[in-house]
């Protein structure tokens, strides 16, 4: 019984230990890396916005034809 409890308690300890090791290895991105990531995210936003706009642009007239003016 005590072994089972010990095994259950070991899981959070190992998780915490691994998490601390991971945080210690992490580092902040330098300026060049940050700018590159920001540009990639911005490009993604623009592309997704354009796709959404085009879908809406096509959907509204198509909906008017199929459903009629409500």
UniProtKB/Swiss-Prot annotation:
<dbReference type="GO" id="GO:0008320">
    <property type="term" value="F:protein transmembrane transporter activity"/>
</dbReference>
<feature type="topological domain" description="Extracellular">
    <location>
        <begin position="59"/>
        <end position="70"/>
    </location>
</feature>
<keyword id="KW-0811">Translocation</keyword>
<keyword id="KW-0813">Transport</keyword>
<dbReference type="GO" id="GO:0071261">
    <property type="term" value="C:Ssh1 translocon complex"/>
</dbReference>
<keyword id="KW-0653">Protein transport</keyword>
<dbReference type="GO" id="GO:0031204">
    <property type="term" value="P:post-translational protein targeting to membrane, translocation"/>
</dbReference>
<feature type="transmembrane region" description="Helical">
    <location>
        <begin position="40"/>
        <end position="58"/>
    </location>
</feature>
<dbReference type="InterPro" id="IPR008158">
    <property type="entry name" value="Translocase_Sec61-g"/>
</dbReference>
<keyword id="KW-0472">Membrane</keyword>
<comment type="subunit">
    <text>Heterotrimeric complex composed of SEC61-alpha, SEC61-beta and SEC61-gamma.</text>
</comment>
<keyword id="KW-0256">Endoplasmic reticulum</keyword>
<dbReference type="InterPro" id="IPR023391">
    <property type="entry name" value="Prot_translocase_SecE_dom_sf"/>
</dbReference>
<keyword id="KW-0812">Transmembrane</keyword>
<feature type="topological domain" description="Cytoplasmic">
    <location>
        <begin position="1"/>
        <end position="39"/>
    </location>
</feature>
<keyword id="KW-1133">Transmembrane helix</keyword>
<comment type="similarity">
    <text>Belongs to the SecE/SEC61-gamma family.</text>
</comment>
<dbReference type="Pfam" id="PF00584">
    <property type="entry name" value="SecE"/>
</dbReference>
<protein>
    <recommendedName>
        <fullName>Probable protein transport protein Sec61 subunit gamma</fullName>
    </recommendedName>
</protein>
<comment type="function">
    <text>Necessary for protein translocation in the endoplasmic reticulum.</text>
</comment>
<dbReference type="InterPro" id="IPR001901">
    <property type="entry name" value="Translocase_SecE/Sec61-g"/>
</dbReference>
